[in-house]
Structures are given as C-alpha cells and as structure tokens.
Curated annotation (Swiss-Prot):
GO BP terms, alphabetized: protein-DNA covalent cross-linking repair
Xref: Pfam families: SprT-like (PF10263)
Principal localisation: nucleus
Documented effect of changing residue 659 to W: In SPGFX4; uncertain significance
Gene Ontology molecular functions: SUMO polymer binding
Record's protein name: Germ cell nuclear acidic protein
Residue stretches of biased makeup (Acidic residues): 124-333
Length: 691
C-alpha cells in the first residue's frame, strides 16, 4: 500500500479553458482506509469528477464531493472496484473510466445533478464505515492525498510534524466528520481549504459549495443541525479530520463550544473516546499529527481522556443533540450511531485493552476524565441499559439487608437514645408536679366562690338592695374611724403663743362675749399673722372694720395709695357681721383678707387672687397647719332671722328683717306666692311677736 502510494504520480491540473475529468483513486489494504482526492473544476467550464475506489478486506472507502462550476452543470461519476489493483497514471484512470462507460454514455451523462438546484451527492459503499459513518476520511488545509502526496502532503501512515495522516488531521484541518464553525461538510469542507491536489482547494466544496454527503452553511444535514453550520456528526472550530480532530478540531462525536455534536460537546475539543490536551482522535491523537494506530508522545489513547477534554457523551451548554433538527435542517431520516460509541466507552473490548498499554498519561488525570465520561455515558444510555440496573440493585441492597456490624452500631445507638430519652420522662414528671398547684388553686377559687353564693342568698332574704348590703358598715366603719382619727389628730402649730386652734370653743370668744371681745380677737390674730407669716413687714396697726351691710360677703380688703403728707400704700379690711358671727369665721376671713393686704403692701401687686395672694395663703397654711385651707370663697351657712317660703316649690328665702312685701314679690323659680315662716328660737320654740 505504501509503495503504491509512493509510485502514484501527482495528477496534473487541466487548463481552465478545457473540459477536465478529475479522478479520485482510493486503494486500501487490511485495516487501512483510503483517502479522497478532490479537484476543483474550472469555474467557467463543465467538469467531471471521477471517484475510483478499491477495497480489499476490512477497508473503508471515502466519499468524494465536488463543487460544480457556478454557472454550468457538473456531473459526478463514481467508480468502485473491489480489486486491490489501482491505476497509476492519469491516462490509465481515464481509460478505465471509458471502459466502464462502454454503453456510449459520456461521463457527463452519468449521475448528472445540477449544482445550482441541489448539491451533488455521491454514494460510496464501504464495508467498514467509520464510527460516524463518513466516506471521506482525510481533508487537509494543504490537501493531503492518500495516494498522490503533494510536496506539503504526508504519507497515510507516516505523519510528519506539520503533516497529517489519512486519519490524522492537521492543526488547521478538520475531520470529515467534524465541520468547521463557518462551514459544514459531512466529510471535510473548509473555508480556506481546497481540493486534495490544490493547496487552497477544498476536498469536497468551496465556501459556497456543498459536499456529496454534507451540505454547506446554508444546507441542512440529515441528522445534526448547527447554529451556523450543520454536520452529519460533529462540527469543528476550524476544520475536522476524518477520525481525529486537532487542537481546534473536534472528533466525530465531540462538538466545539460554538458547534453542536450529535451527542457530546466539549469545552475545547472532544474525542469520541479519548480526547488529547491539544487534539482529540477517535483512535490516536498527536500534537501535530495523528496516526491511525500509533500515537505520538503528546497523543493520548482512545480511552485516555485529557484534563481539558470531555467524554464524547458529555453534552455542552451550547451543543445540540444529533436527533434535534435545526431551523434550516431538512433531512431527519439518518440518525447518528451514538449508542455504539457509548457502548464502546462503557463495555471493555480487546481494542481498548491494546490501547490501554499505549496510554502513558498520568492516571490521576485519566481517572478524573473517566469519571466525567461515566457521567456522560450514563446520560446517553437508554433506560434499558443492562449496566444501569445492577447499580440500582446495589443501592437497594443496603436498605433491604444490612450487614452485621451496621446492625450492632444501630443497636448501640438505640441503647444510647434510650438513656437520652429518660431525662425527658423525668422532666415530664416534674411538669406534672408543677401542674398540680394550679389544680389546688382551682379548688381554692371554688372555696372563694362559695361565700359569694351565700351572700347572694342573704341579699335575697333582705329587702335592702344588694348594692347597699355590699356597702355594709363593716367596711365603712374602719374608714370612718380612720377619718375621725385624722380629724382628731390635727397637727399642732409650732409658733409660740399661737391660739388659733379651737378658738370657737373658748368662752371668751363665744355667745354674747363675742360682741364685747371681737375687736381684741381681731387685733391678736393680726399681730400673730404679721409676726409668723409676714415677718413684721406689715404696719403695726392696720384699719380693720366691721360692716353690717354685707349680707353674704364675709370680708373685704380695700387697697390704695396716699399722697399726703407723704406717698405710701395703704390697705383697709372690712369684716361682715352678718356672715362672720363666730370666732372661727372671723379668724379665717381675717387671714384671707390679710393675704391681699400683704401682696399689696409688701410686694405692691394688685392681682386679686393671683400668684402673690396664693403665695401668702400657702405660707400661712404651712406655718399654721391647724388652720383650714385658705380658699378664694367661703361656704358658710348664713344664719337669717326671718325666712320666707314659697307655697309652690317650698323654697326658702332668708332675711334679716321683715322688710319683704309678700304681695309684691313672688318666687323666682315657680312664680308662686311667698309666705313668712314664723320665727323660732335656737331650741325650736316659736317666737310670739310682742306687737
């Protein structure tokens, strides 16, 4: 195979003015896969694409996609041969093509599909399709041909540092199963890549061309839609290899951040089974190139995931499932074989055992990634997976049957809990003891209620209302006794020579003696008050007179100023004889009027019963506590000699003389006639007039 590939001459590009036939010759041996050769036809001439595939043993051919000229129709002719022999020259290939079309049918008449209406589709039968079922296996930015290598191309099995094998993509190249973000090809479309013979030509289609198996950005794949591009299996950031994506490329089942994979997206790049730090290959990835069976020093095994790579089954936030069609997708008939890949990641096979020997990456990183792969696989597994059921049964085992040591620990714990539960029981007993006193209190309250019932029964028997009975003498007597004691316990005056207390009881100032000794009584009260309350600021002698005309007024204080012989204030006090007919009334009235005189003579204030008067009134009560409180008005009961009574309302009107004419005056309340009540003495005997 290698010799055959080396001896193949490089195809010559036809001139643009002539019609040309482009032959794609694929040869494969055991456990190898050929690569597709694509040529760009002239833009203004009709072109024919010939795809010659030869297979032997377990080999897989690749599909050939050609971009038809923009203004003319193109045709694609596919030649499949099962023999291992291949044509080495351009003339032999053309002759073989003419022999096949011996029925006088020109190549242009076979399988003619206008490119303007719909992209041509080339169907190639391969015995062993790839995991993602893609015919074309190796596109390269520099267009590497598996049989006719270019100056910049590498051998199918011997990759160079900058070259990619038929199964190993370059850094800028994408697998046939992983389309670029800006272009979608089921095999390999690239925005900047051209045909396998031309450095700038694409293997299947240009920016506006569509591959035979994969539509362009504006075309929809049969299975997998993408936001910007649709790939049959996997989109790539820049380009995708047939089986192994590079740093920027994704595997057949691993989409990039912006691309949607059929089942598993990756943050940077995802491999179907083993992602690499810089590149992911379905079987073996290398830093610069990936070989189909031998991985480089920086390459990882198909089962060894990288730190930055995720499993093929782990979905990404921006990735879409292969079964979900895009808005621009049309075909929904061909599903992606994602379950096969998941089963390969879960079930160990002989190939995985061989690959594990080649995995030299650290076990810690691989174990971490393996955990992520298991998560992805479990998500993609169907509900009838045989491996998922044993895990559920194992989880149920500890609940159904507990081991002996666990039972012992639970028994110990139960015993501990019993000891812990005991104190609350004691507390409950304590609380019961606490609850008992309220019950006793309830009984006490019942005892208290019973006397009330007895009292109610008593009130029923007594004709007196229960309100009066409640106000029984037993309650009033102590209070009344206390009040009487307070009255009897009048404080004594500390002023020496004070005689104001019990003045009305003295014989000297009572009865007929009061009329003879009333002037002496008034002068003694004035001197005592001037000395104790006013601090002798009042004059020694003050005019205090008697007024017999004031019928209801007890006293009167007249204040003013005198300008002759010199300016001075003066005050004059008058006491009504008809109201003040006892020694105690003369005393209280005189003290009241002396407060007015002191406020004017000492302070020079005319405020009637204002603050100055109140000051002296409070001071007099403070110094002489035995005196009654000095107030503004008196409440004395006037002793009239003559009373007139209304015949209607029985109201009485007092008079000192019999001067009221009952024929002229009537009662003010009821307008009834007035009648004079006969005079009586103090003992109640009637006084008979002497006239």
């Amino acid at each position: 195979m290698d010799g055959c590939k080396k001896e193949l001459p490089r195809l010559q590009e036809p001139e643009e003015d002539e019609d040309c036939y482009i032959l794609n010759v694929q040869s494969s041996s055991d456990d190898t896969s050929g690569s597709s050769v694509a040529r760009r036809a002239p833009k203004r001439q009709a072109s024919c694409i010939l795809n010659v595939q030869s297979r032997s043993g377990d080999t897989s051919g690749s599909s050939v996609a050609r971009r038809a000229p923009k203004r003319q129709a193109s045709s694609v002719v596919v030649i499949d041969s099962d023999s291992d022999e291949e044509c080495h020259t351009h003339e032999e290939k053309k002759a073989k093509l003419l022999e096949i079309n011996s029925d006088d049918e020109s190549p242009e008449c076979c399988h003619v599909k206008p490119a303007i209406q719909e992209p041509p589709i080339v169907i190639s039968d391969d015995d062993n399709d790839d995991d993602n079922g893609n015919d074309l296996e190796v596109p390269d930015d520099n267009s590497d041909d598996s049989e006719a290598p270019d100056d910049n191309s590498d051998d199918s099995e011997a990759p160079d540092d900058n070259s990619d094998d038929s199964e190993a993509p370059d850094d800028n190249s994408d697998d046939s199963e992983a389309p670029d973000d800006n272009s979608d090809d089921s095999d390999v479309p690239d925005d900047n890549s051209d045909d396998s013979s031309d450095d700038n030509s694409d293997d299947s289609s240009d920016d506006n061309s569509d591959d035979s198996d994969v539509p362009d950005d504006k075309s929809d794949d049969s299975d997998v839609p993408d936001d910007s591009s649709d790939d049959s299996d996997v989109p790539d950031d820049s380009s995708d290899d047939s089986e192994a994506p590079d740093d920027s490329s994704d595997d057949s089942e691993a989409p990039d951040d912006s691309s949607d994979d059929s089942e598993a997206p990756d943050d940077s790049s995802d491999d179907s089974e083993a992602p690499d730090d810089s590149s992911d290959d379905s079987e073996a990835s290398d830093d610069s190139s990936d070989d189909s069976e031998a991985s480089d020093d920086s390459s990882d095994d198909s089962e060894a995931p990288d730190d930055k790579s995720d499993d093929s089954d782990v979905p990404e936030d921006k990735s879409d499932d292969s079964d979900v069609p895009d808005d621009n997708s049309d075909d929904l008939e061909v599903p992606v074989p994602a379950e096969d890949l998941c089963n390969e990641g879960q079930i160990a096979s002989d190939e995985e055992e061989l690959v594990e020997a080649a995995a030299a990456v650290s076990q810690h990183d691989s174990s971490d990634d393996a955990g992520e792969q298991d998560l992805g696989e479990n998500l993609s597994k169907p509900p009838s997976d045989p491996e998922a059921n044993p895990e559920v049964s194992e989880r149920k085992l500890p609940t159904e049957e507990e081991p002996a040591p666990v039972v012992e620990q639970s028994g110990k714990r139960k015993s501990k809990t019993k000891t812990i539960v005991e104190p609350p029981r004691k507390r409950q007993t304590k609380t019961k003891n606490i609850v008992e006193p309220p019950r006793k209190r309830q009984t006490k309250t019942k005892n208290i209620v019973e006397p009330l019932r007895k009292r109610k029964a008593k009130t029923k028997n007594v004709s007196v209302t229960p309100g009066h009975k409640k106000r029984g003498p037993s309650k009033k007597k102590p209070g009344a006794a206390k009040v009487e004691k307070r009255k009897t316990r009048t404080p004594k005056c500390k002023v020496p020579g004070c005689f104001l207390q019990d003045l009305e009881k003295s014989k000297k100032y009572s009865g007929k003696n009061l009329k003879r000794n009333k002037d002496e009584l008034v002068q003694r009260i004035y001197d005592l008050f001037n000395r104790s309350v006013c601090d002798k600021k009042l004059p020694e002698k003050l005019r205090i007179g008697w007024n017999n005309k004031m019928v209801k007024t007890a006293g009167l204080c007249s204040t003013g100023e005198m300008w002759y012989p010199k300016w001075r204030r003066f005050a004059k006090i008058q006491i009504g004889l008809k109201v003040c007919d006892s020694a105690d009334r003369i005393r209280d009235t005189l003290i009241h009027e002396m407060c007015h005189a002191a406020s004017w003579l000492i302070d020079g204030i005319h405020d009637s019963h204002g603050d100055a008067w109140k000051y002296y009134a409070r001071k007099s009560n403070r110094i002489h506590p035995e005196l009654p409180r000095v107030t503004r008005c008196h409440n004395y009961k006037i002793n009239y000699k003559v009373h007139y009574e209304c015949t209607g309302c029985k109201t009485r009107i007092g008079c000192y003389t019999k001067s009221l004419d009952t024929s002229r005056f009537i009662c003010a309340k009821c307008k009834g006639s007035l009648v004079m009540v006969p005079l009586t003495q103090k003992d109640g005997t009637r006084i008979v007039p002497h006239v």
